[in-house]
């Protein structure tokens, strides 16, 4: 058997760096439980360029970013979770930078790195909110599901931003909407892990 050209290219990437930075970092625990307070996150000197440069200098071709782990905390400002994400950290409120993932992506591009995302299907925060594992029925949903004052409404109405229909549970719709955000608003995402 011979690998396809795409498979051979993937093998040639060599090392993939894994960046797992989130709310659990500030609670000295491996996994969060969904009840952690984002306002505890207030680092000084956060330098995503330094992170990306370190990966590039180490010979990595791509960084896999944990954008949401099992605790449900997100490194970006999601329309679908407005409480347990980077926008609610003390550092975001102090600096006005509500989207750490966007900074990481920009730094990765600056240093020639591809970006992948790790998105955990488990979500302790949404379980506490009654969304994850609530045994809801699969009903047809439109993805993206526009929220109040959604900045994408014009693009959806004009057809510039595609939509699709899918039968999903409450959490399935939440997850699909977040993946839609991540895969349409951050440029080229090379790989997705669950």
For the regions a language model picked out, list residue spans one by one.
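Mature catalytic domains of secreted/periplasmic carbohydrate-active enzymes
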Residues: 1-194
